[in-house]
């Protein structure tokens, strides 16, 4: 009987870099996808609830309303950014413009989302970027817990990372967010949610999300 051995992405990359495996990074199926960040440029902090403490209903995707959140930046050090919120069950993505890359801008976006979705917004899974530093205020005012992924582990927020990669087809790195109009953001957001996905049995995120709202 065969046994399945699970190996972390980091272990594979370390073995390649050390020459233990006779292959290169380019030989990997997803070699164009970075599994770890070379350097975190946004600033970080180390507090908050661990992703390991998330309840089972968040992990198994059987319950709607659980979101992953992230920030999409341009190539500039300052200026606007985009907040992305991805619902884990339906893969629905909600895109919001941020006037800055700071915690105040992200806090405003999350509280706005909480006001819009009301009881349909449940725990958020995020990273330790400085834009989430106001997590205590968010938890208090939005009445939802925030769970933080481990450092340099974007795969722990895989739904968000995947949707962000598709978003980058429309907003490539280096393009100032200020150049994108509100109408263009709406159109991009609608396209992403209207596109059938294999993981949804070729249904669309908006279809699944709205169906869950009715039940």
What are the residue ranges of the model-derived segments?
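Short alpha-helical "recognition helix" segments of helix-turn-helix
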Residues: 1
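Basic, flexible linker segments flanking DNA-binding modules
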Residues: 4-60
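Mobile genetic element proteins and their domesticated derivatives, centered on retroelements
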Residues: 12, 70, 85, 91, ...
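Two-metal-ion RNase H-like nuclease active-site motif
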Residues: 64-74
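Short conserved beta-strand segments at catalytic cores or DNA/RNA-binding microdomains
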Residues: 72-94
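Active-site beta-loop-alpha junctions of metal-dependent nucleic acid enzymes
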Residues: 75-78, 95-118
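Acidic/histidine-rich, metal-coordinating catalytic segments
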Residues: 119-134, 152
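Charged alpha-helix within mobile-element recombinases
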Residues: 139-146, 150-215
